[in-house]
Amino acid sequence: MKIALYSDLHLSVHPLELPPTSADVVVLAGDLQRPATGMAWARQFAQPTLYVAGNHEFYGSDLASTMAELRQQAQGSPVRVLEREEWRHQGVRFLGCTLWSDYRLFDSPEQREKGLQMAQEFVR
């Protein structure tokens, strides 16, 4: 199976036109751009296309509403939005999960600060 993998394209900063691909599956692994324009770009592929959101898809929003928006926009297209889900194609199992954290857990300033501290320690 041939897979075309695209990630961190940041299309709002660097627009990109891709040539047609002969891949069996297209995987969009996050950070395309905001949901509406990112999904419009994702829908260009004729192949089954998997879209796993990255942190940039959530800017100015939250996980639940952004995922709902992406799923709604994917309806009627070959794009499948994966969030803690799997999809099987030609005997291959694809798993998708966003690795983004909302540091406003329970809207508690203490929890947000603790989460940010933990993230900074992890990066070091």
Where are these regions (language model features)?
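Solvent-exposed, flexible loop/coil residues
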Residues: 13, 91, 104
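Proline-centered loop/turn at the N-terminus of a beta-strand
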Residues: 48-50, 80, 93
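Glycine/small-residue-rich loop that forms an oxyanion/phosphate-binding "nest" at active or ligand-binding sites
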Residues: 63-87
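Generic beta-sheet signal
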Residues: 52-54, 84, 97
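Beta-strand-turn-beta hairpins that frame and shape the catalytic cleft
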Residues: 1-4, 86-96
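Active-site-proximal loop/helix segment associated with metal-binding centers of metalloenzymes
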Residues: 95-124
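Residue-level detector of flexible, active-site-proximal loop/helix-junction positions
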Residues: 10, 56, 88, 101
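N-terminal active-site segment of His-dependent metallophosphoesterases
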Residues: 1-51, 58-66
